[in-house]
Amino acid sequence: MESSRKSYVLMLFLAFVIMNVCSVSGEPKDGEIAGFEMEEARYDACVNACLEHHPNVRECEEACKNPVPP
């Protein structure tokens, strides 16, 4: 009885490790994709808002790449 319990726990542990390894080496998760798209949208909005006041595109891009925290 005790050995079957140990083997069951070992199988669960191995399944957990395999799932984590596959998720790291595989495609990005949905949250990572959404986070990247949200960051890209924030950057585009920042550049567009900056260009309304400043004609220099390069300065706006640099300012939006390294935003100053509030």
Swiss-Prot record:
One of its GO terms (cellular component) is extracellular region. It is found in: Secreted. Disulfide bonds join C46-C64, C50-C60. Its main location: secreted. Residues 27-42 form a propeptide. GO terms for molecular function: potassium channel regulator activity; toxin activity. Residues 1-26 form the signal peptide. Negative results: has no effect on other potassium channels, on sodium channels, on bacterial growth and on smooth muscle tissue (a known assay to identify possible bradykinin-potentiating peptides). Voltage-independently blocks potassium currents on hKv1.1/KCNA1 (IC(50)=217 uM), and hKv1.4/KCNA4 (IC(50)=71 uM) (expressed in CHO cells). Belongs to the short scorpion toxin superfamily. Potassium channel inhibitor kappa-KTx family. Kappa-KTx 2 subfamily. This is Potassium channel toxin kappa-KTx 2.5.
